[in-house]
């Protein structure tokens, strides 16, 4: 998470300093990014002083250790750092009466990667088949990523021609991913089968957007999840509220028993994550969504491939190694999610706050979608969008 944010903020001309305990990782960051990197423990007052905590405007504690992040945040408070963000995953901290509130700890934003990742998956399941989903306009408008199918109504025609033919269409193509390139479409742009397009539409016009790409939206009623990770637990509770029948497969017997006690309306199965016969016995062929959420990226990719070969409509894999993300489409998995990346948009939106209401970074796409308030100083006021 830290390296991703450091790269983005550095590109925006912020002076960025990263504290990194791993010497190999420190060297990589120095070679790849135009930032200052300090070797050491983020909870150490000496290291934080060396990193210039007295002069910083924003401190983000985003290590894998909640305790280091909390200690670093307390240090930032003592040094009167104006804004502080901490990554805290352990729900026990949130259950202590206001212990993590801004008043008691002084942290401005707390982020939970696993919860944000589960939320991202829930949103994807509410728009089946989409690879990306983001809400704008208080949830009234959606950005969704869809793949253009062979024979889709949009193939071959320019966007200008389609605009004339579909006089009252209520969606907008904002970006296209084609053969690894990102395109911002104009009137003459023609869509091709296999294009990955990002459409902005009102929630009530989702079916039109699907039809445009040659797809039919089928609501998810059953889901199968592999692995009893934190992401899985958060997601199961969300799916229970959505009335989606969910089966969770966990290989560790004691973990499966503990999860069965915690989850009310989720069917817990003790078994190996790659036991295809077990999946079939538990209704894989009738499942609308298969979610590979174990702690092993390779296992998630492999099981996702198997599920896709069983014609499961929606397959999502949890991948924490970001260099695996390009493999997703090649093995037939619909989309990948990452608990590390799930909080990036949340943090960036907060960092840029002010007039920015929402922000979405598109996977495998160099574009970024931003919802902002047009103030009196905005140069685009009273200017036709076509200009």
Give names to the regions the model predicted.
Residues 1-387:
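Cytosolic regulatory regions of ion transport systems
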């Amino acid at each position: 998470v830290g390296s991703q944010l450091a790269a983005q903020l550095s590109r925006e001309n912020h002076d960025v300093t990263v504290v990194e305990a791993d010497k190999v990782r420190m060297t990589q960051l120095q070679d790849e990014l135009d930032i200052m990197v300090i070797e050491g423990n983020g909870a150490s007052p000496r290291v934080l002083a060396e990193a210039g905590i007295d002069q910083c405007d924003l401190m983000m504690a985003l290590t894998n250790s909640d305790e280091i992040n909390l200690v670093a945040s307390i240090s930032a408070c003592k040094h009167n750092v104006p804004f502080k963000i901490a990554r805290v995953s352990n729900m026990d901290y949130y259950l202590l009466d206001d212990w993590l509130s801004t008043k008691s700890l002084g942290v401005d934003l707390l982020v939970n990667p696993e919860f944000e990742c589960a939320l991202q998956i829930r949103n994807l399941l509410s728009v089946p088949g989409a690879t990306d989903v983001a809400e704008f306009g208080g949830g009234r408008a959606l950005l969704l990523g869809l793949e253009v199918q062979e024979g889709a109504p949009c193939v071959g025609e320019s966007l200008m021609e389609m605009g004339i033919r579909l006089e009252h269409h209520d969606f907008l193509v904002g970006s296209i991913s084609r053969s690894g390139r990102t395109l911002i479409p104009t009137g003459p742009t023609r869509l091709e089968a296999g294009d990955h397009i990002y459409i902005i539409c009102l929630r009530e016009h989702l079916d039109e957007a699907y039809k445009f790409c040659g797809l039919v939206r089928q609501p998810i009623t059953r889901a199968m999840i592999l692995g009893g990770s934190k992401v899985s637990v958060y997601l199961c509770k969300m799916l229970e509220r959505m009335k989606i029948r969910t089966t969770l497969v966990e290989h560790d017997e004691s973990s499966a028993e503990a999860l069965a006690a915690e989850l009310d309306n989720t069917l817990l199965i003790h078994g190996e994550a790659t036991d295809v016969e077990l999946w079939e016995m538990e209704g894989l062929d009738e499942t609308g969504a298969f979610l590979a959420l174990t702690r092993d990226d390779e296992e998630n990719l492999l099981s996702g491939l198997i599920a896709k070969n069983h014609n499961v409509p929606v397959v999502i894999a949890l991948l924490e190694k970001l260099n695996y993300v390009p493999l997703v489409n090649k093995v037939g998995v619909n989309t990948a999610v990452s608990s590390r990346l799930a909080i990036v948009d949340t943090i960036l939106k907060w960092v840029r706050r002010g007039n920015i209401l929402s922000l979405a970074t598109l996977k495998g796409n160099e574009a970024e979608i931003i919802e902002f308030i047009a103030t009196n100083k905005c140069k685009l006021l009273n200017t036709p969008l076509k200009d």
